[in-house]
Amino acid sequence: MDTILALTGITKRFPGVVALRGIDLRVARGEIHALLGENGAGKSTLMKILCGIYPPDEGTIAIDGEPRRFANHHDAIAAGVGIVFQEFSLIPDLNAVDNLFLGREWRGRLGLRDRARMRRAAADIFARLGMAVDLSAPVRELSVAQQQFVEIGKALSLDARVLILDEPTATLTPAEAARLFGVMRELKRQGVAMIFISHHLDEIFEVCDRITVLRDGQYVGTTQRARTDVGALVEMMVGRRIEHSFPPKPPLARDAAAVLEVDALQVRENGPVNRFALREGEILGFAGLVGSGRTSSALALIGAKPARVRRMRLRGRAVRLSGPADALAAGIGLLPESRKTQGLITEFSIRHNVAINNLGKHRRLRWFVDAAAEARATRELMKRLGVKAPTPDTRVDTLSGGNQQKVVIARWLNHHTRILIFDEPTRGIDIGAKAEIYQLMRELTARGYSIVLISSELPEIVGMCDRVAVFRQGRIEAVLDGDAIDANTVMTYATSDARGANHEHA
């Protein structure tokens, strides 16, 4: 094997915790190497060490057999290590050329920027990627996929020989992801080594050559893609074999009482008027393509988005929800798609995040919060939901994605909310944490909670939902239940004009 990158015995300690313990990693020239592990396994810490952001406490880094010590990120770049983070670092109002050469502009003899030369170099880079990018347009006008290719181009313009791709498909459509994989294969052909981090095992099997798994900051093993399967990888990641990600569905209760009846919901002027109902103890899926109206309908439902028409009944009584505060008072809670920016105050503790929707619950002498009672209640919810953290006063930004999602759920349970809207609840969460979230959702419905599940992942919709409302162009095309819930049927209604006869099903 023509090894270009060798990490040996990498150990990293932070106060009170050993984040990495003796990690070994070998990556060959022209190889796409997957790095797998649950959130908190140490992937990000290892990549930050490779990029010069953290120094290792023990261990060595070698590039082309030459030992390297990176004092900072610039040292790693100079050694040929590039990274494309999940969150882009582009300047929105600058074009692709200016973003590529920001801070290291090429200059002519008079010290002026040589724009023509930089533009030619940028065109060569994108030709190398096989991508057409408008070099004159501000990058904010480019698609998400094109912005990602600009990030990759930045790394290549710095002569990156080892390229780290951190969850690169998280915001891409399937077509854009396929285009990215084509670019990765072309870079592989050119001899660039890539470390590919993804929670999507189907992507790993599609594009990677070898796979290294970390668990709890330790090296578990490296395997050839062709010599393993999904079950074996999951067992390596979580330390146990997960036979079924989705818990069994209970029998469909067609006579269950409706807790929420939406008699008319029209999000935009001249748009379709939808009707649906949510039953006690069920998971109702909102399925459809991006832009189909799933999320906008849910936001309009709770008053977080304006609606032209909104008529609904809560447990048989007419209710007006003019905003999220009204929804909160009515016992309806939203777990938003972006938990870090919309669902949590990440700089706050678990206790403060759990209590924020119900500050009066543990008040004493009218004005003072009983911090001890608040901590006890938070500790009970942490135990009930399986939140892995030392204390209720642990900061939320130190938790994994799965544990952060559980904190959002705990906040609503602390308020005794009985109707929960989950918007993309497992996005960015590893496979073990997904199984825990799914089990938790079923435990909630068994206690009489009702859930609306909005998801772009068809297996999640099919595996978790008792009924599914399929949206297309803002309209509910059909409400499916029982054996009718399968991927083909959902996609047929989501993409075709064949409207279901029961699209006003209640």
Curated annotation (Swiss-Prot):
CDD domains: ABC_Carb_Monos_I, ABC_Carb_Monos_II. One of its GO terms (molecular function) is ABC-type D-ribose transporter activity. One of its GO terms (cellular component) is plasma membrane. InterPro entries: AAA+_ATPase, ABC_carbohydrate_import_ATPase, ABC_transporter-like_ATP-bd, ABC_transporter-like_CS, P-loop_NTPase. PROSITE patterns: ABC_TRANSPORTER_1 (PS00211), ABC_TRANSPORTER_2 (PS50893), RBSA (PS51254). Its EC number is 7.5.2.7. It catalyses: D-ribose(out) + ATP + H2O = D-ribose(in) + ADP + phosphate + H(+). ATP binds at G37, E38, N39, G40, A41, G42, K43, S44. It comes from the Bacteria. It is a peripheral membrane protein. Keywords: ATP-binding, Cell inner membrane, Cell membrane, Membrane, Nucleotide-binding, Repeat, Sugar transport, Translocase, Transport. Its main location: membrane. Residues 5-241, 254-498 form the ABC transporter domain. It is found in: Cell inner membrane. The complex is composed of an ATP-binding protein (RbsA), two transmembrane proteins (RbsC) and a solute-binding protein (RbsB). Part of the ABC transporter complex RbsABC involved in ribose import. Responsible for energy coupling to the transport system. Belongs to the ABC transporter superfamily. Ribose importer (TC 3.A.1.2.1) family. This is Ribose import ATP-binding protein RbsA 1. It comes from Burkholderia thailandensis (strain ATCC 700388 / DSM 13276 / CCUG 48851 / CIP 106301 / E264).
